[in-house]
Amino acid sequence: MTSKVVAAAASAFLSRTNELGNLQKSCIRILSFCESNSSRIGLHIHCPVIKFGLLENLDLCNNLLSLYLKTDGIWNARKLFDEMSHRTVFAWTVMISAFTKSQEFASALSLFEEMMASGTHPNEFTFSSVVRSCAGLRDISYGGRVHGSVIKTGFEGNSVVGSSLSDLYSKCGQFKEACELFSSLQNADTISWTMMISSLVGARKWREALQFYSEMVKAGVPPNEFTFVKLLGASSFLGLEFGKTIHSNIIVRGIPLNVVLKTSLVDFYSQFSKMEDAVRVLNSSGEQDVFLWTSVVSGFVRNLRAKEAVGTFLEMRSLGLQPNNFTYSAILSLCSAVRSLDFGKQIHSQTIKVGFEDSTDVGNALVDMYMKCSASEVEASRVFGAMVSPNVVSWTTLILGLVDHGFVQDCFGLLMEMVKREVEPNVVTLSGVLRACSKLRHVRRVLEIHAYLLRRHVDGEMVVGNSLVDAYASSRKVDYAWNVIRSMKRRDNITYTSLVTRFNELGKHEMALSVINYMYGDGIRMDQLSLPGFISASANLGALETGKHLHCYSVKSGFSGAASVLNSLVDMYSKCGSLEDAKKVFEEIATPDVVSWNGLVSGLASNGFISSALSAFEEMRMKETEPDSVTFLILLSACSNGRLTDLGLEYFQVMKKIYNIEPQVEHYVHLVGILGRAGRLEEATGVVETMHLKPNAMIFKTLLRACRYRGNLSLGEDMANKGLALAPSDPALYILLADLYDESGKPELAQKTRNLMTEKRLSKKLGKSTVEVQGKVHSFVSEDVTRVDKTNGIYAEIESIKEEIKRFGSPYRGNENASFHSAKQAVVYGFIYASPEAPVHVVKNKILCKDCHEFVSILTRLVDKKITVRDGNQVHIFKNGECSCKREETSFV
C-alpha cells in the first residue's frame, strides 16, 4: 500500500465515522501500514487522536510514537510523549534509545531521571541505552550510579547491558573493570564480543583488541563482518602483516565481502601504500557503491598517485556512480597536495554543477586547495564566506592557511569570531593560532591561549602541548616552555625538536645539546627529524667531537641516508674546519638538492677556498640544480671576502636576470660590502639610494665600516647618522664612528661619541668564545684588563706563551687588553687541556681581532698543532704559522 493511498484512506475514514472503538482499531491498522518516510500520514492520524481523546490508548500512542521516531522526528515524538497520559516502559525506552542514537546524550539521561521519578522500572534495553549515553559523554560518575541500579535489578549478567557497561568502562580508560565485567557475562554473543573489540580499538589498545579476537575464536563465537571491520582498524596501526592475517581469516571463514568490509580493506591497504591490493579488493565482487570507489580514490590521493586517483575518479563516473561530497573532497585534497590550481578550479566548477556548493566537506576542501595553491588568500576567504554552515574544520583550515600566507595577525580575530559564533575550537585550531604567536613572538597571546587551554583541561594534550612549547621558546620564555613539557601527559620527538630548533635560533646551543639527556630520560630516541637540530647545535659551538658522535649515531640508527641529516653534517664539518669530512658526507647524498649544494659552497667559501666554492657552484648549475636566494647570499659573501668585486657584481645581476630571484636587503648588504672593500664608495652609496627596498641599519653600518677603512670622514658621518636613525641603540655604530674620528685626527669627537654611548647606557657587545675539550664545551668571555684577576691560570699561560714568542724572535709584542680577549683564552685552554694529537677548534661570536689572529698564527709556528677559529665572518685554519684566510690584516677591520 503506497503512502498516498494510505493517506487518502485515513482521511476518508476519519471523516465518515465517530465510532471510537472502530476509530482506534483503524488508526492502529493504518499506522502499521505506514512507510518510514510517511510522516504526513502520521500527522493525519495524530490530529484525530487528540481531537477524539484517544491518548489513553497505549497501543495507539506507542505506534504513533514509533512512527515519529522512524521519520527522524525526535522532537515531535517528544511532544507526543509528553501528551501521553500513561507511559509504558516501552515508550520510555523507545524515547531514551532515540536520544542516544541521535547523540543527544544529556537529553537521554534527563529523560531517564524522569522515568525513575515516575516509578516506571527500566528493562535491560533501557539500561543499555542509558549506559551508552554515559559512554558518549565519558561520564563514568553517572555511569557508575547506573551500574549500581543494574546490579540491584539483577541485569548485570545480561549480555546486552553487560556489553554496554564494558564499553563504558573501556571508553573511560578503566580497562581492568571493563574486562572483569565482560568475563562475568552470561553467554556473550558476537555483538558483545564485537563491542568489546570496538571499545579497545577506540581506546588505541590495538594488541588487546587482537587478543580479544583470539579469545573470541577459542570460545567458539563466530565473528561477523563488523568484527573484522574493527580488527582492520587495529591492523592499520599494528602493521601490514597483521592486516593480511585478518584478511586471510575473512576468506577462510567465508565472510561475504559486503561494501562495508571491502571499504575497510581498501582503507587498510592504502595506508600501507598497497594500492594494487586495494584495487583487487575493489574488483573482487560485483557489489560496489560510491563509498567504496571513494575509498579507492582517497587511497591514491593519500599516496600521491595523482594519475591513478584521477583515472579512478573518471572511471567511477563512467560506470554511472555519481561522486559524492567525500569523493570531491578527496580529489580537491589531491589538487592541494600537487599544487594544481587549474585542476582544482575545474573540480570547483563541477561541484557547483552537481549541487555540492553548500556541502561543508567540499567547502573545507576548497578553502584548503585555494590556500595551498594560490599566491593569495582572497579566493579561499571568498569560499569560506559563502559557506552555509562552516564547522570547526572550516575555521581551522582558514586559520592555518592565513598563518602559512603570513597573515598571522588576522588569526586572532578569526579565533574570536569563531568563539563568538559558538564554534568550539579544537586542539588543531589552537595549535595553528599558537604557530601565529610563534611567528610574532607574541607572549601575551600565548599566555591567553594557554589560560583557555587550562580551563578546557586540554593543555596536556601532545599536539597542543608541542605548539605551546614552540610558542613559549620562540618568545624567549624558556622556563615556561619547560613547565609545559613537564605538564604534558605524553611527549614525543616533536616536543623536543621544536625546543632544540628555538634554542638554536636564540643562540643557546649548549642548552640545545642538553635536551638529548631529557629525551633519553623520557625513553625517546633521536630520529631523522630531531638529529639535524642537535648536529646544528654542535656546528655552532664548534663541538666537532660531539658532532662526530652524532654522525656515528645516525649511521647505527639507519638515518645516515636521510637528506636532512646529511645536509646538517656537511654544515657541521664545514663549520668545524673539517672540510675533507664535509666533502665525504656530501658525496654520500644520493640526490643533492639546493640545501646540500648550499652547504658545500658555503663550507668551501668560509674555510677560505673561494675558488673551489665558485667551482662547486658551477658544478651545481651543470647538474641542473636551481640556485635559490640563499645560494646567492653565499656567493656574494664569498666574493666580498675574496675581493672579487666584478664577479660579485655579475652574480648580483645573474640572480635577478637569469633566475628571477628578487634581491632582499641581505643581498644588498653584501653588494655594498663588496663595493666598499674595493673602495668604490660612490657606487655603494648609489646602490643604497636606488634600491627598491627600504635600507636597514646593517647596510649603513657596512658602508660606515668601509668609510673607516678608506678614511672618508664626511660620508662616514652621514652613514652613521642614517644608521642611528634606524637603530639608535646599536653600540657597533657608535664604536665604528668613534674609531673613524680617532683615525681622522678628531679625538675630541671620538670621546664625545663614547660619552654619548655611556649616557645611553650602551656597552660594547662582549666577545664570547667556546672550545670543545674531551666532549665538553667550555665558554670564555672577553674581560676588561682593569678588572681581571691576573693570577688566573689562563692569564698566566697566555703571558708565558707571549714570553716564549719573544724568545722565538718574533716582533709580536701583543696588546695588553687583547690578552683577555675570549678567543685567546679559548685557544690557550684548548692548547693546554686537549690531547696532544687533537686539533683545537674555537668559535667566536665576533670577528677575530688583528692581535689574536697574529698570536694564534705564531703559536702554531711554535708547536705542531692545527688550530681552527671560526669567527663572525669565516673559518680561520692555522697551521705552521699560516692562516687559510691568506689576507692582509685589513680584512679584520
From Swiss-Prot:
PPR repeats: from-to residues: 57-87, 88-122, 123-157, 158-188, 189-223, 224-257, 258-288, 289-323, 324-358, 359-390, 391-425, 426-460, 461-491, 492-526, 527-561, 562-592, 593-627, 628-658, 664-694
Keyword Repeat: yes
Gene Ontology molecular function, alphabetical: RNA binding; zinc ion binding
GO biological process, one term: RNA modification
Keywords: Chloroplast, Plastid, Repeat, Transit peptide
GO cellular component, one term: chloroplast
Chain intervals for the UniProt region annotation (Type DYW motif): 807-893
Keyword Repeat in annotation: yes
Domain of life: Eukaryota
Region (Type E motif): 699-774
Compartment annotation: Plastid, Chloroplast
InterPro entries listed in its UniProt record: DYW_dom, Pentatricopeptide_rpt, PPR_At4g14850-like_plant, TPR-like_helical_dom_sf
Residue numbers spanned by region Type E(+) motif: 775-806
Classification via PANTHER family: PENTATRICOPEPTIDE REPEAT-CONTAINING PROTEIN, TETRATRICOPEPTIDE-LIKE HELICAL DOMAIN SUPERFAMILY
Similarity remark: Belongs to the PPR family. PCMP-H subfamily.
Protein name: Pentatricopeptide repeat-containing protein At5g52850, chloroplastic
Species, as recorded: Arabidopsis thaliana
Gene: PCMP-H31
